[in-house]
């Protein structure tokens, strides 16, 4: 059994990732109270930052992986981007709940004709010997004109993101979402990479 340590404390990410990386002989462990300041300028930099921090915490002896992801909107100069999780504080200097954050995006997009947006995910994996591999995934879509208040699934910006078949991410169950999402695509690449080293 190979144990991988996932550098996150986000329960939503943990649930999505555990479903995708459901591989026999691989166990995913979550560190307790893991919280690293994301000071990178790109998704890749932030992902590496988290992976390297956890690798160091585990005395450079355990395989670790991390991911950084976010929403990039063309009409907003690719914001929220790396600030997706804390866009409220970046833009307004105060903390908002998920619905309020989605309202902020809808308001900023009110006069915009170009509603093209992308969800981007970068995974960084550090093996026991210190070798680093990165995996990327992207989902293209558009920003909706309003919020799905009846969301049954998803989290974050899912209620305002329309996929190319005009469905909100919040309308999809976890299995459906993982088949098309940025995170699903990136972790599928990571999964294929890991499978090479299993008996």
From Swiss-Prot:
Cofactor(s) recorded in Swiss-Prot or TrEMBL: Mg(2+)
Active site per UniProt: 68
Family: Belongs to the HAM1 NTPase family.
Annotated cofactor note: Binds 1 Mg(2+) ion per subunit.
Name this polypeptide is given: dITP/XTP pyrophosphatase
Alphabetical keyword list: Hydrolase, Magnesium, Metal-binding, Nucleotide metabolism, Nucleotide-binding
GO CC terms: cytosol
